[in-house]
């Protein structure tokens, strides 16, 4: 029987850098996490994962089986560099090829959810054409994901195009496909002028996972928990009352810290205390 416990995961970039997934998953287990979210960002090193050999993919599957710590999701931020809305046909084609490879990779190793970055373009100026190309690129991507039975889930971003659940729902309704859902980040959601609880309630039925981090207006990364504007207890309580039973992922970038494990343990305890106050988990 599956546990009724709320699944709590940690972002890969919170843990020490490196390519040994067995070591990473063992550490995550020691720290009390149920799963790790993989990052495929715009760096050549992490993009290279999409070209892993059969043996490398099997090694990841084996590490999951040995440790019992899952890798159910991928944060695919590589589209900052190769955006689906690019007006350069070659760049856009590369973005679609990255999507194809990511979906194939997910299918091979058991990743169920690919979190998408909601940028039509990132390093260029957005306009009506980039938004149109982005929509068309999403449609093509969701068609690929449907055939592979892999869910694409849109993150709520640090970018105006996708800075609320309401805006992301517009894309969900446009695509009208069960393999396209939402993956809100309560930090990003709170950093904008959103009615956060109303937004979370609006997304119920489409939310497949939740990123947990703190933010300040205009500051979307590396804000220590408790020093930002996020009302964690209210967010957790709203999600619980709305019937959300899915995973929560602590998002941090402590892989280059002097002691990443200690940083993660501190954040884990802080977040779990707020979860307990909201009735999501039992108090320690």
From Swiss-Prot:
InterPro entries: L-Ru-5P_3-Epase, L-Ru-5P_3-Epase_Enterobacteria, Sugar_Epim/Isomerase, Xyl_isomerase-like_sf, Xyl_isomerase-like_TIM-brl. The keyword Kinase does not apply. The keyword Isomerase applies. Pfam families: AP_endonuc_2 (PF01261). GO terms for molecular function: intramolecular oxidoreductase activity, interconverting aldoses and ketoses; L-ribulose-5-phosphate 3-epimerase activity. Its EC number is 5.1.3.22. It comes from the Bacteria. One of its GO terms (biological process) is L-ascorbic acid catabolic process. Gene3D superfamilies: Divalent-metal-dependent TIM barrel enzymes. Pathway: Cofactor degradation; L-ascorbate degradation; D-xylulose 5-phosphate from L-ascorbate: step 3/4. It catalyses: L-ribulose 5-phosphate = L-xylulose 5-phosphate. Keywords: Isomerase. Induction: Induced by L-ascorbate. Repressed by UlaR. Catalyzes the isomerization of L-xylulose-5-phosphate to L-ribulose-5-phosphate. Is involved in the anaerobic L-ascorbate utilization. NCBIfam families: hxl6Piso_put (TIGR00542), PRK13209.1 (NF009688), PRK13210.1 (NF009689). PANTHER family: ISOMERASE, L-RIBULOSE-5-PHOSPHATE 3-EPIMERASE ULAE. Belongs to the L-ribulose-5-phosphate 3-epimerase family. This is L-ribulose-5-phosphate 3-epimerase UlaE. The gene is ulaE.
């Amino acid at each position: 029987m599956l546990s009724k416990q709320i699944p709590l995961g940690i972002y890969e970039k919170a843990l020490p850098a490196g390519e040994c997934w067995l070591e990473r998953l063992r550490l995550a287990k020691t720290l009390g996490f149920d799963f790790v979210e993989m990052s495929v960002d715009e760096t050549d090193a992490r993009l290279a994962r999409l070209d892993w050999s059969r043996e490398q993919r099997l090694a990841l599957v084996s590490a999951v089986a040995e440790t019992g710590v899952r890798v159910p999701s991928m944060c695919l931020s590589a589209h900052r560099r190769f955006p689906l809305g690019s007006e350069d046909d070659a760049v856009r084609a590369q973005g679609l090829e990255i999507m194809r490879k990511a979906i194939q990779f997910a299918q091979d190793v058991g990743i169920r959810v690919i979190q998408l970055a909601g940028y039509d373009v990132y390093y260029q100026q957005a306009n009506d054409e980039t938004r149109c190309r982005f929509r068309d690129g999403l449609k093509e991507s969701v068609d690929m994901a449907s055939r592979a039975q892999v869910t694409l889930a849109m993150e709520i971003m640090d970018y105006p195009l996708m800075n609320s659940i309401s805006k992301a729902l517009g894309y969900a309704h446009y695509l009208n496909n069960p393999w396209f859902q939402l993956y809100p980040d309560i930090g990003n959601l709170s950093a904008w002028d959103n009615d956060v609880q109303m937004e979370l309630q609006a997304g119920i039925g489409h939310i497949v996972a939740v990123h947990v981090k703190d933010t300040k207006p205009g500051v979307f990364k590396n804000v220590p928990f408790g020093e930002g504007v996020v009302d964690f207890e209210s967010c957790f309580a709203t999600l619980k009352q709305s019937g959300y039973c899915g995973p929560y992922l602590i998002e941090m970038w402590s892989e280059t810290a002097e002691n990443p494990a200690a940083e993660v343990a501190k954040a884990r305890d802080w977040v779990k205390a707020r979860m307990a106050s909201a009735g999501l988990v039992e108090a320690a």
